[in-house]
Structure formats: C-alpha cells, structure tokens
Amino acid sequence: LALTLPWVLFPTPTSRWLNNRLLTLQNWFIGRFGHELFTPVNLPGHKWAVLLTSLMLFLISLNMLGLLPYTFTPTTQLSLNMGLAFPLWLATVIIGMRNQPTEALGHLLPEGTPTLLIPVLIVIETISLFIRP
C-alpha cells in the first residue's frame, strides 16, 4: 500500500484528449479532497487551496512511509514539522492582523475580564499566541 500510494495520488500529465481511468480517478480524488477541505471555508479563503491541498498530500505520502517495515517517517522529526508549521502559522497571524486588526487584537482579551486583570491577561494571551507553533 505504501509503495503504490505515490503512484495513485499524484497524476502524471498526458497529451491525450481523453484521460484513462487511473488519471480520472486521481483527478477526482484530488478534486474531492480539495472540496472537502474547503467546504466550511468562505470564498476569500479558497486562495489557500493549492497550498493546503499539496501540503496535506505531502504529509499523507510521508506518513504512509511508516507502513513500510524498517523505515522512519520524516514527520516524526520536530525540524520538519516546525519548518512546515511555523511559516503557515505566521502567515495566518499576519494576514489576520492585516485584514481584521480589531478582531485579531480582541482575541488577546477575553470578554468579561475584571479591570485589574486586563494588563496581565493581555500579556498572557500574547505569550500564548507566540507559543502556539
């Protein structure tokens, strides 16, 4: 299963007018995967479709390597996970701050906070924002 997965997941381009069954199945799988991933996301968020779909297919194929005996999956390394997660996290935080600054800053203070706790909670929430990746 792990050896055939890259062959099944990634379609090969062809110059034919009509696709064969395997290429049609591959394109259907990738299209369906993208549809399922972005059904709950609004229309401006669909510009992330290519990046997130390719990232998910990459992670699936790397994790399928773990099915092979005596192999080590690269996703167990923290350096690979941080290398993939940190730029995406930073991009979403920066885009959120740029597009909706009041709502993004509003997440730094929970509703109903007593006045004496406001400075402390803003510092705590800011630290927790940067600890997330």
Swiss-Prot record:
Compartments, as annotated in UniProt: Mitochondrion inner membrane
One Gene Ontology molecular-function label: proton-transporting ATP synthase activity, rotational mechanism
Presence of the UniProt keyword Manganese in the record: no
Membership in a protein family: Belongs to the ATPase A chain family.
Membrane topology, from the record: Multi-pass membrane protein
Entry-linked PANTHER family: ATP SYNTHASE SUBUNIT A (PTHR11410:SF0)
Reactions catalysed according to its record: H(+)(in) = H(+)(out)
Ranges annotated as spanning the membrane: 48-68, 77-97, 111-131
Organism lineage string: Eukaryota, Metazoa, Chordata, Craniata, Vertebrata
Mitochondrion is among the record's keywords: yes
Disulfide bonds: none
Its biological purpose: Subunit a, of the mitochondrial membrane ATP synthase complex (F(1)F(0) ATP synthase or Complex V) that produces ATP from ADP in the presence of a proton gradient across the membrane which is generated by electron transport complexes of the respiratory chain. ATP synthase complex consist of a soluble F(1) head domain - the catalytic core - and a membrane F(1) domain - the membrane proton channel. These two domains are linked by a central stalk rotating inside the F(1) region and a stationary peripheral stalk.
GO biological process: proton motive force-driven ATP synthesis; proton transmembrane transport
Name of this chain's protein: ATP synthase F(0) complex subunit a
Complex formation: Component of the ATP synthase complex composed at least of ATP5F1A/subunit alpha, ATP5F1B/subunit beta, ATP5MC1/subunit c (homooctomer), MT-ATP6/subunit a, MT-ATP8/subunit 8, ATP5ME/subunit e, ATP5MF/subunit f, ATP5MG/subunit g, ATP5MK/subunit k, ATP5MJ/subunit j, ATP5F1C/subunit gamma, ATP5F1D/subunit delta, ATP5F1E/subunit epsilon, ATP5PF/subunit F6, ATP5PB/subunit b, ATP5PD/subunit d, ATP5PO/subunit OSCP.
Gene3D superfamilies, alphabetized: ATP synthase, F0 complex, subunit A
Main localization, broad class: mitochondrion
Record key words, sorted: ATP synthesis, CF(0), Hydrogen ion transport, Ion transport, Membrane, Mitochondrion, Mitochondrion inner membrane, Transmembrane, Transmembrane helix, Transport
Tree of life domain: Eukaryota
A GO cellular component annotation in the UniProt record: proton-transporting ATP synthase complex
One Pfam family recorded for the sequence: ATP-synt_A
